[in-house]
Amino acid sequence: TRRFDKFPLRVERLSGQNDVPVIVASEALLRVCPVEEGQSLRIVGQLRSFNNRSGQGNRLVITVFAQSIEPGDGSYFNRILLSGALCKKPVLRRTPLGRSICDVILAVNRHYGRADYLPCIAWGQTAVQIAGMDVGERLALEGRVQSRTYTKLLESGSEERTAFEVSIMQLLDEEETEETALL
C-alpha cells in the first residue's frame, strides 16, 4: 500500500502575507526529495478536496496532492489552472469599500469518476462576469491557492480555523488549463 505524509508549505504573496496550503505527498516521492523545514521547494500537483465528517476542524478539507517535488530557487510562485463546472449558484456581494466579490464552488473532475469541489473567489469585473453564470456552466481559470484564518463560533466557545480557496486571477479558454497547481 502507498503511504502518504502531509506538511504545510509557506508561500509568500507580493503583499508580504503568507498562504500556507497543506501538501500531501507519497513517502516514495519524499524519499526522492526529502523535505526540511524552511527549505525552498517547487511542487507540481492537483488541488484536492474531501468532506471531513469527524466533526473536528473544517468540514471541507483542501490539500495539494504533490505529483512532483524538487528543490526550489528561493522565489515564491503560486499558480493554479482549473477547469470545471459551477455546482452552486455564484454569490455576488460587495466589500465594505464597494468592491465586487463573487464566491463559487467549482466541481473539477478527476480519474475514476471522482470530483473535487473547490471554493473559488473572484474580484471586480471577473466577479460580475461569473455572477451571471448558471449552475452546470463550464469555467476555466487561472488563480492561486489562498489561505485565510477565521474564528468559528462554537457552543463551547470559539476556535481559530483556516479556510483554503482559489483566488481567481483571470478566466481562460478551457484548452489553456491543465488542472495543475504550481507552488
Regions found by a protein language model. Give the residues of each.
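Single-stranded nucleic acid-binding surfaces, predominantly the OB-fold ssDNA-binding core
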Residues: T1-L183
